[in-house]
Amino acid sequence: MELETSVYRPNAAVYDSPDGVEVRGRYDQVFAKILTREALGFVAELQRDVSLGMLRYAWSAVERQNVVTTFVLSLGLTLPLSSSEIGEWVCSVCSPPAVADRRVEITGPVERKMIINALNSGAKVFMADFEDALSPSWENLMKGQVNLKDAVDGTITFHDKARNKVYKLNDQVAKLFVRPRGWHLPEAHILIDGEPAIGCLVDFGLYFFHNYSKFRQTQGSGYGPFFYLPKMEHSREAKIWNSVFERAEKMAGIERGSIRATVLIETLPAVFQMNEILYELRDHSVGLNCGRWDYIFSYVKTFQAHPDRLLPDRVLVGMGQHFMRSYSDLLIRTCHKRGVHAWEGMAAQIAIRDDPKANDMALDLVKKDKLRQVRAGHDGTWAAHPGLIPICMDAFGHMGKNPNQIKSMKRDDASAITEEDLLQIPRGVRTLDGLRLNTRVGIQYLAAWLTGSGSVPLYNLTDEDAATAEISRVQNWQWIRYGVELKRRTGLEVRVSKELFGRVVEEEMERIEKEVGKERSLREECIRKLARCLQSSVTAAELDDFLTLAVYDHIVAHYPINVSRL
């Protein structure tokens, strides 16, 4: 697949970088204020320290998949770090007062207008996302760093020329958390000692270096910065993050425990290691969050070779399913036992401005979901759109004057949850419509991701990001592999095959071209290339670990190697 890239000009300026660091992304004077010699040196030191530790746990995707599946299915869940499970220890008792109340959080990519609107939204927290909601192109990542620095400085503005409107921050804004990429994604535009930088350390390191001092003054009340950590599979990863935090605190000369982080529990292995993860991060933790969409993706990926564990249509895999409810309840109990917040994730429905009936349906779904969450004992929730914040805030108003439910909802009843509860096979039908929806979402999301957008409003009134696109991909792959019988609208069944899927792809491409081809400036040939890319992934003999990793090279735009110094 060929995508348009920037043209290199021989007389272009280059970044000033320290020994061992090469910056191969496009030069920009504004970016250069972020990519200073000192900031790049800081990132390089973090990577050199971390690389030594990560080498001990390095394993191929195939090896990891085999170990994870065996680990989960064996139910041999006794772990070596026994002190993390037993005893009455709690995470740091000096919890930052700035984040005692996090009942509603809004999430979104690190785009300039989004940052302003989210900070002004009335939510308690804004999670600025370098991960699933962002396509990690060089331009997006560097503009995101610039935007966050301006936000922390309080100087961020945005001029919407079409509306002739200037956006700026209110006096009262949400607390800022930043989510870096997962460990699996590299940053190919920066080389450290000849190897691609680790994406999450670039995101974390540049943001921390430029903002820790100002953030602690204006946002953190002496603490911070604050982070969300995604895609963890094992407490070893939490231990590595803890060492990164301690190294950063030491280099900055701030107190140990200043940095605080919430971990997303969004993989099947991690749900069995929540105590261990909190224990490793006990001086830096402020809670765990149910990353429900990635969790479903992880369930399918973990059991990819087990035809007895096929999921129904993804729209049917909600928190009402026993294995999902068990996961959420156990997370609440674990967090409250250890003195930190528990969240359940996204209300992905978005406001529908031009369809009052559809809008009412979406808002009703959100209201019911949020009331269920607060009654279960969660301390807060996520919203994908500012229009949903009043509904979420009203639901969590049931907590009364208390900023959280850590002491009032211990959920000791969840101690009875077993491994079988967490692995119970979900119920529901598998349909041809489900296969079609997965295919449409996959093609359209991939098109958006490769052209710079990471979060896209698509079908079912939802905001799709990488997590839901990944569910669609792996579910189609599994259904094809095992020739699953799918129900048609007529009630008859049809067996999935590569040939059937090929016909579905062609039909859904035609539908997409009619619906959004011209509107979103997606050329017909571009759509067809993307569809072929997805079709190849879904029908491959082996399942790719992450679709975004498999297609990452298509958004990399390298410039000549001699860009390391002025």
From Swiss-Prot:
GO BP term (any one): tricarboxylic acid cycle
Keywords of the record: Glyoxylate bypass, Glyoxysome, Peroxisome, Transferase, Tricarboxylic acid cycle
Catalytically driven reaction(s): glyoxylate + acetyl-CoA + H2O = (S)-malate + CoA + H(+)
SUPFAM superfamilies tied to this protein: Malate synthase G
Gene3D superfamilies in UniProt: Malate synthase, domain 3, Malate synthase, domain III
Superkingdom to which the source organism belongs: Eukaryota
Cell location: Glyoxysome
PANTHER family reported in the protein's UniProt record: MALATE SYNTHASE (PTHR42902), MALATE SYNTHASE 1-RELATED (PTHR42902:SF1)
Protein's name in the database: Malate synthase, glyoxysomal
Organism: Raphanus sativus (Radish)
Lineage start: Eukaryota, Viridiplantae, Streptophyta, Embryophyta, Tracheophyta
